[in-house]
Swiss-Prot record:
The alpha subunit is responsible for the aldol cleavage of indoleglycerol phosphate to indole and glyceraldehyde 3-phosphate. It catalyses: (1S,2R)-1-C-(indol-3-yl)glycerol 3-phosphate + L-serine = D-glyceraldehyde 3-phosphate + L-tryptophan + H2O. GO terms for cellular component: cytosol. It comes from the Bacteria. Belongs to the TrpA family. Pathway: Amino-acid biosynthesis; L-tryptophan biosynthesis; L-tryptophan from chorismate: step 5/5. Keywords: Amino-acid biosynthesis, Aromatic amino acid biosynthesis, Lyase, Tryptophan biosynthesis. This is Tryptophan synthase alpha chain. HAMAP family: Trp_synth_alpha (MF_00131). Pfam families: Trp_syntA. Tetramer of two alpha and two beta chains. CDD domains: Tryptophan_synthase_alpha. Its EC number is 4.2.1.20.
């Protein structure tokens, strides 16, 4: 299990990538680039054929990964390869619930432990239905990351009271994706979550520019960035796949990732 130290001058930067997009071995290099760019932790997404919470950018990434035969077991093992290849920041498996159900629970958590994965985030599992999975995470030393969306104060309080690692604060309802602006109500919602949470609060769903990062960092402890980074991978995929241009493409990706970065310390 992991915790994030709150240091006033530092901000949390949690990037998301899809396992196996564009290729598994490149995912490892992308993870290392994100670590170099200042990532506090990494969300490693398991590609899924029916990703209800994801917009078109991540849907396309899932399709590319699935076309390369990526699945939940291979994604977990890919996380283990990242650890063996110098990724020391926490790796959080981001997966829909159905792939977890298809594995025996003991087998699933044994795989997470064997591959030194640190956390689990299940976006389509409502808080009220997550008790069993949270208990299993505690039993196996895995940090369960909770999502909180705009809802009643009493429900926010229930979610934040049991939160571990950090709270993933959903900036807007609907699917993930790049957004140019956020509703005015987001500010009061984030302040409300932050006021109730004993762990850092990171805002995600739609963060796509350094200006938005600055705005969210004033309200919360940091940001989760997915679609913007996955879109950059999509733009660079041909250069990433070709050995002769890979190093240059990784440098371009790292430079782009740094525009979202803080320097939150992990303990």
């Amino acid at each position: 299990m992991f915790n994030l130290k709150k240091q006033p001058s530092d901000k949390l930067f949690v990037p998301f990538i899809t396992a196996g997009d564009p290729l598994p071995e490149i995912s490892i290099e992308l993870a290392k680039s994100l670590q170099e760019a200042g990532a506090s932790a990494l969300e490693l997404g398991v590609p899924y054929s029916d990703p209800l919470a994801d917009g078109p950018v991540i849907q396309r990434a899932s399709k590319r990964a699935l076309d390369n035969d990526m699945n939940i077991v291979k994604a977990i093992r890919l996380g283990g390869e990242m650890k063996k290849n110098g990724v020391h920041i926490p790796i959080i498996l981001f997966t829909y619930y159905n792939p977890v159900l298809q594995l025996d629970t003991d087998h699933f958590f044994a795989l997470l432990r064997q591959n030194q994965l640190d956390g689990l985030l299940v976006p389509d599992l409502p808080f009220e239905e997550s008790v069993y999975l949270q208990q299993q995470c505690k039993k196996h030393g895995i940090t369960y990351i909770s999502l909180v969306a705009p809802t009643s104060e009493s429900r926010i309080q229930k979610i934040t009271q049991q939160a571990e690692g950090f709270v993933y604060c959903v900036s807007s309802l609907g699917v993930t994706g790049v957004r140019n602006e956020f509703e005015d109500s987001v500010s009061s919602f984030i302040r409300s979550v932050k006021g109730m949470s004993s762990v850092p609060v990171a805002v995600g769903f739609g963060i796509s520019s350094s200006k938005q990062v600055e705005m969210m960092n004033e309200l919360a402890d940091g940001v989760v960035v997915g679609s913007a980074l996955v879109r950059k991978i999509e733009e660079l995929k041909d250069e990433l796949v070709a050995p002769e241009t890979r190093e240059q493409a990784l440098k371009a990706f790292e430079a782009y990732a740094k525009t979202f970065s803080g320097s939150y310390m992990v303990k």
